[in-house]
Amino acid sequence: NYLRCHDDIGWGLDEPVEESLGIDPLKHKEFLYHFYEGSVPGSWAMGELYNYDEASKDARSCGTTASLCGVERALITHDKPLLAISMKRDLMMHSAMSFLRGFPMLSCGDEIVQLNGWEYKEDPDRVEDSRNLHRSPFNWENAAKRKQAGTLQKQMWDGLKSVREMRD
């Protein structure tokens, strides 16, 4: 089980169930990928679309777990309440995933609150693939902060450690 991996998020929704609930599957999917892109008013997420198809209105989502949970937006806007809830959201998602049947896996950087790697847009060999947004090099400087009190990295590291201990 994992929240994020090296690839995009495909919104494989159970369309017959959605229809039985009176939900338009296409509109729901469009809302989800635009919300996690950050273009829906009130969205906390910062991500990008991948393989948007105008004809079918299909798209996938890209971004790191922390950025999709709102940490990046909170840091940019200096919004302390948003930062606090975004960190809780990130840890809650990992906690829920960790207690599903199976083996929980972290995407590289989830344990240190790794943000999107927007620098991929400056690399002509990588700019055409928005999946590179969450494929940036591991941030070793932030990894060292997991041992420093008061950092986001320590907060997440300790939170994930507690989840692991509960699971054991």
Where are these regions (language model features)?
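Active-site and adjacent substrate-binding regions of carbohydrate-active enzymes
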Residues: 1-168
